[in-house]
């Protein structure tokens, strides 16, 4: 289960980074832009307005601290959901349950679950690309990295 309640320490850490220039405890698109620029990121006014709109539940045109916490929680939920789906897909392919996908397991999955089935050469190329530790198999970390890169 995903924990949507932040500890007091987490809230304090978030609050430290959540600073409004005028001290009103809300951040405008302009303040958000200035903060992001100080971190080396640059966005257009339209992009900043969209970022504000995405988490501005009271439609005030600014982000309050509580809205920022909810926005972070929502992103964490989405990430956790994706991660759990990656894990399920990996577990479905890992027939012997040893925590790595062998070439045989990957070939079985890619030749029976995908239309048209992938060739052995294409699957070998995927393994070569994803196999960071050179053991000829794909572990969970390599699998997630492969999925995210495709």
Swiss-Prot record:
Residue(s) carrying N-acetylalanine: 1
Residue ranges annotated for the EF-hand domain, each copy included: 7-42, 43-78, 81-116, 118-150
SMART domains noted in UniProt: EFh (SM00054)
Binding site for Ca(2+) 3: 94, 96, 98, 105
Binding site for Ca(2+) 4: 131, 133, 135, 137, 142
GO cellular component: cytoplasm; nucleus; spindle
Cellular localization per UniProt: Nucleus; Cytoplasm, Cytoskeleton, Spindle
InterPro entries linked: Centrin_CML-like (IPR050145), EF-hand-dom_pair (IPR011992), EF_Hand_1_Ca_BS (IPR018247), EF_hand_dom (IPR002048)
Claim: DNA repair is one of the keywords in the record: no
Domain of life the protein comes from: Eukaryota
Amino-acid positions noted as binding Ca(2+) 2 in the UniProt annotation, renumbered to this chain: 56, 58, 60, 62, 67
Binding residue positions for Ca(2+) 1: 22, 24, 26, 28
SUPFAM superfamilies, per database record: EF-hand
Keywords per UniProt: Acetylation, Calcium, Cytoplasm, Cytoskeleton, Metal-binding, Nucleus, Repeat
Single GO molecular function: calcium ion binding
Functional summary from the UniProt entry: May play an important role in mitosis of sea urchin egg. May function as a Ca(2+)-dependent intracellular modulator of microtubule assembly.
Protein name as it appears in the record: 15 kDa calcium-binding protein
Organism: Hemicentrotus pulcherrimus
